[in-house]
């Protein structure tokens, strides 16, 4: 099992990785998501316990599925 903070940090790192791969700044990404830049920054640093609704918004904005967005963060082996 992954510690709560670890999963938030891993999720934030994944969001940052995908955002940067698309060449988006935090500000531009936040605007596309309809979320505040400081909120996105907190998510990326693992400081926000993100709501499932916002996970969906982020995934759609990044053009990935929720499972692609969360890939590799649970600490469990993918099958």
What residue ranges belong to the model's regions?
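Short, charged recognition helix plus adjacent turn
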Residues: 2, 70-79
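Short, conserved catalytic or interaction motifs in soluble domains
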Residues: 45, 64, 71
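A short, Lys/Arg-rich alpha-helix, primarily the initiator
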Residues: 1-21
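Short alpha-helical DNA-recognition segment
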Residues: 23-45
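DNA major-groove recognition helix of helix-turn-helix/homeodomain DNA-binding modules
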Residues: 53-68
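Short, basic-rich loop-to-helix N-cap that marks the start of a DNA-contacting helix
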Residues: 47-57, 78
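Alpha-helical residues within the helix-turn-helix
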Residues: 20, 31, 60
């Amino acid at each position: 099992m992954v510690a709560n903070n670890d999963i938030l940090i891993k999720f934030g790192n994944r969001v940052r990785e995908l955002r940067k791969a698309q060449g988006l700044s935090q500000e531009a990404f936040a605007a596309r998501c309809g979320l505040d830049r400081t909120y996105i920054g907190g998510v990326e640093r693992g400081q926000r316990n993100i709501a499932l609704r916002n996970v969906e918004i982020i995934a759609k904005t990044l053009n990935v599925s929720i499972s692609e967005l969360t890939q590799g963060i649970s600490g469990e082996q993918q099958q």
